[in-house]
Amino acid sequence: MTIDRYRRFARLAFIATLPLAGLATAAAAQEGANGKSFKDDFDTLDTRVWFVSDGWNNGGHQNCTWSKKQVKTVDGILELTFEEKKVKERNFACGEIQTRKRFGYGTYEARIKAADGSGLNSAFFTYIGPADKKPHDEIDFEVLGKNTAKVQINQYVSAKGGNEFLADVPGGANQGFNDYAFVWEKNRIRYYVNGELVHEVTDPAKIPVNAQKIFFSLWGTDTLTDWMGTFSYKEPTKLQVDRVAFTAAGDECQFAESVACQLERAQSE
């Protein structure tokens, strides 16, 4: 993004966590990385793991208010809903969750169906920033409703972005569930869509270094039209998440179809 969306969030500070014994990885050196490998199928919304944004927005560019009422799980699917509903000073309500812990180098994966509608942003990303007394570092997958045939990839390092890359989503990101993953290492980031490598970053100046939280969000704008398209609301729409997983560097992969599993198999051949 071009705006530090999350400067207003209250955050907890955590200590670093070591990976498996005997596996000295760069992740161990990331200050504040206390999150361990996990997989969440969203049978329920575990609020010990997830913080639900509620009662605010991130600035004038956002035309909706985060509301916990827009966040729920249904039949093993996390649903974040955008709809016309006045909440505080906004006429629309939207949903967001974030992990309570921070995560470092490893493989991040989510199976997602994006929302419909120009002017909307369906996002799976990691973020840390000034509210946590850290520089703004961020790694993004964002489906912009104006063109759901693509997913925008991006990184921020100390609030410097401008690294946008558009990757194809065969069949459309809003037509069914697709798998998005990135492998974050000290010296590179690899991005995958449905198990296929679509983008790789190796410039050290473009690779974040600070441990971050995992976010899912669905929000809209009336003003960022060049980027997200002209806002056009027709009916309530949802960002749906079937699964999310994090595999720390050096840990075993979390599920059979995981990109981390694919990379493990490739290394053993």
Curated annotation (Swiss-Prot):
Subcellular location: Secreted
Keywords: Exopolysaccharide synthesis, Glycosidase, Hydrolase, Plasmid, Secreted, Signal
InterPro entries with a match to the protein in the record: Beta_glucanase, ConA-like_dom_sf, GH16, GH16_AS, Glycosyl_Hydrlase_16
Record-level GO BP terms: polysaccharide biosynthetic process
Signal sequence region: 1-29
Annotated CDD domains: GH16_lichenase
Pfam families in the cross-refs: Glyco_hydro_16 (PF00722)
Top-level class of the enzyme under EC nomenclature: hydrolase
Pathways involved: Glycan metabolism; exopolysaccharide biosynthesis
SUPFAM superfamilies xrefs: Concanavalin A-like lectins/glucanases
Biological role: Cleaves high molecular weight succinoglycan to yield LMW succinoglycan. Dynamically regulates the molecular weight distribution of succinoglycan by cleaving nascent succinoglycan only during a limited period after its synthesis, perhaps before it undergoes a time-dependent change in its conformation or aggregation state.
Protein name: Endo-1,3-1,4-beta-glycanase ExoK
Gene it is expressed from: exoK
